[in-house]
Amino acid sequence: ASSATGDYGASSATGDYGASSATGDYGASSATGDYGASSATGNCGASSATGYKGASSATGYKGASSATGDYGASSATGYKGASSATGYKGASSATGYKGASSATGDYGASSATGDYGASSATGYKGASSATGDYGASSATGNCGASSATGYRGSSSAEDAETIAVAWGYKSKAKGVKGSYLVFADWEGDESEYWKPDTWTLKGAKMVQVDGETIKEDTWYIIENGEVKELEE
């Protein structure tokens, strides 16, 4: 077990089942052993867990968190935090404003809940979700799912067996040939877009990217029940 609580402190646990924690500002924490846990809670802190089943968490302002081992979990909750889980079945979550979350392993899950956040799942059957306003979500793996639920969010499907869901008000979606796009048709006062409880769901529609009626790599939106190509 390793712990550094002072400002600018560094903490490292490399043995199996080790635990590492750095709670001071600018602190760094690393646990590379199997089942290791790493946590950096200070401002601008960095946390990394590379061992099998490792867990990594960075909760401070601009914190960075990375879990590269199998079944690893990574979470960055601070403002502009970055979270990455590259191992098999890894989970990555960034909840801060403008946070970035990426899960590249098979069955990985990636979630960005802050406004302007970015979420990407590239592994087989990965799931990617961006719930903040103007958030971007992308699923590039086979059978993956991408969802953007915030106002004017972006959702993209980069594989033929992937679904992109544009569920947020005024959200857009695109995909490659063979993929499916799902849209929610909302009615509401756009000047008060930040009040989702005032939106009214009029319906939903799913289309397949066939390369003709619905073009590849082209943004689409839904208006009055009709899926339309977005005019930038």
Describe the function of each predicted region.
Residues 93, 156, 163-232:
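Intrinsically disordered, low-complexity terminal regions
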Residues 1-156:
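Thr-biased low-complexity repeat/linker tracts and other Thr-enriched repetitive architectures
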